[in-house]
UniProtKB/Swiss-Prot annotation:
Main location: cytoplasm
Entry's Gene Ontology cellular component terms: cilium; cytoskeleton; Golgi apparatus; microtubule; motile cilium
Ranges in coiled-coil conformation: 60-156, 185-377
Keywords (A to Z) from UniProt: Cell projection, Cilium, Coiled coil, Cytoplasm, Cytoskeleton, Flagellum, Microtubule
Lineage top rank: taxon: Eukaryota
Lineage: Eukaryota, Discoba, Euglenozoa, Kinetoplastea, Metakinetoplastina
Compartments, as annotated in UniProt: Cytoplasm; Cytoplasm, Cytoskeleton; Cell projection, Cilium, Flagellum
Protein's UniProt name: Trypanin
Amino acid sequence: MPPRTAAERGGRRKSVKAPPPVDPLVELTTLESVHDALAKAERLRNYFQVERDKVNDFWTITKGEVETYRNRLFNAEASIEELERSHQVEMKVYKQRVRHLIYERKKKAQACQDESDRLLREAEDRHLQRMNEIQAKLQQQDQQLRAAAADHEMNVYEKRDSHSYMVTVTKTQSHEKELARLQVSCEAKLKVLRDELELRRRAEIHEIEERKNEHINALIKQHEEKFHEMKTYYNQITTNNLEIIHSLKEEIAQMKQNDEHNETLMYDIDRENQNLVAPLEEAQREVAELQQKRKQNEQNKRGLEVTRVKLRSLREEIRRQREEHQALEERYACVHREREELKGKFESALRQAVMVVEERNEVLQQKLIESHALVEERDVQLEGVLRAMNLEPKTLELIATEVDEWLQRKNQLIKDLHFELKKGEKLYSATLLEMERRCQTANIASLPRSNFE
């Protein structure tokens, strides 16, 4: 590009207009107002910057506190859920333990009752046996006493006869005195013998009565000892049950105390949340969620109360089930008899149905075999006849048409027989399925299908 000439530069200067004159005072005033506005804008900017930093810091601190409280609340809810689960597990354990203790108590009580009844029966049998032996001994002694008395009377009678004979023969005073003396001595001996036997009989009767009384006292003492042992055992069971109930009450009181502490903690958390800044919508939503979870916690507490009520109802149900046990056993025996009767009837009916189905299947199979044999025989005969006749083509076609129609009828008959066979098989399968269903309904073990094949 060539340099411009002086004329061009002069023309340029002439074309530019001169600026208007400026008042220095006005310009100075404008400049001061601009500086004031700039300073004010800087102060406002600094103020808003500081306020923004404060709001950000407050937002960060508040968010951290909300997160901390949220974590605390989650921890509290987790601990409450863990306590609830442990409480449910303990309740199940205690229920199982109570059932086990009730079963053991019932079993041991039945065993003690059976043992006491057995011991009592054995003692009664031994007592009756002993009394029978004593009675037999008394009867034997009475018989011996009567036999001895009879022998003694016989001896006395014989001696009396001999003495009478001697008296009649001798008729002397000495013999009479001797007879008197002998009579007196015999009577004395007889009296002594009677007294001795009577004393011995009384002593033996007294000894037998003493042994009987001692045996009765021993049985009474043994029965009292067994009764005292049973009483001590049941008292110990009752004491153990009371201790378990006391421990359960203490655990419930501890859980109530924990619930009160959790409620206090929830109240403090709620109060601290209410003191937070309200404009934060997300924080308000989180607080609403926390309140909803607190309501859920209260519902869990009410569920705990319902569980306690259920525990009491379960205890009542245990007592009621004890009363229903005997009735259920009787019903079970009746149902068992009916089940055996129904089982016998159903098995007999099923065997009859299986026999009928098997007979029909055999008949259909025999008919099918006979039809196939007949068709093959007719085919052979037809081929032989056609070869022997040497007929014309039209005649052969007519004969072939008639044979085809006859074969179609036979094929239709075969299809019908196959259909009847399939129908019988389906009926057989349906019968087996109905048998299994009714066996399951009546709680009867169904017979395997291999028994019907």
